């Protein structure tokens, strides 16, 4: 709760025009009374747009349109439960919710063909990334990511993994 209120306050201070949550805003597809009640204590910055990408923890069905984030949709916040893109003429902003391995297309370009104009906000597996004790074999390939967008921001992996200009993981 403190970190959310800090972010909402910082968004005012920095004159942001939107906040994008990269998935798993909630860590469970079911909320208890305490969690629902805590939502009242969030000091939302309603002067800007809020976009919430559905993560794997916010649903318990393969049809991610059934998700706990829909509760926030009641407050007129945007809930992204399918690949979506919006262009401002300079960049194409691409929003990619969690996609199960069996349903994932082979390439990001199949979702968003604009290449270098793309800025992708995602909550997905990435192949070749260290997840604690094991290395992911499923997900989008690093070479695919680096050739499909100008910037790729991903909320699924809970570490500080990055990809440098030479396409090396750091």
Language-model features and meaning:
Residues 1-87, 145-149:
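Core catalytic region of metal-dependent phosphoesterases/phosphodiesterases
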Residues 25-26, 56-59, 99, 125, ...:
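Catalytic metal-binding/acid-base residues of hydrolase active sites
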Residues 52, 132-170:
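Conserved beta-sheet core of the metallophosphoesterase superfamily
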Residues 58-144, 167:
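Conserved catalytic scaffold of divalent metal-dependent phosphoesterases
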């Amino acid at each position: 709760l403190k970190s959310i209120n800090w972010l909402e306050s910082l968004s005012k201070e920095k004159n942001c025009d939107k906040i994008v949550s990269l998935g798993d805003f909630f860590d469970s597809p079911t909320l208890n009374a305490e969690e629902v009640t805590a939502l009242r204590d969030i000091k939302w910055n309603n002067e800007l747009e809020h976009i919430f990408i559905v993560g794997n923890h916010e649903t318990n069905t393969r049809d991610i349109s059934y998700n706990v984030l829909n509760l926030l949709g009641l407050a007129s916040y945007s809930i992204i439960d399918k690949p979506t893109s919006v262009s401002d003429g300079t960049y194409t902003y691409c929003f990619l919710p969690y996609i199960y391995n069996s349903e994932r297309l082979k390439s990001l370009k199949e979702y968003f063909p604009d290449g270098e104009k793309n800025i992708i906000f995602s909550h997905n597996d990435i192949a070749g990334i260290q997840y604690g004790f094991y290395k992911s074999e499923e997900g989008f390939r690093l070479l695919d990511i680096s050739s499909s967008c100008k910037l790729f921001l991903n909320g699924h992996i809970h570490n500080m993994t990055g990809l440098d200009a030479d396409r090396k993981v750091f």
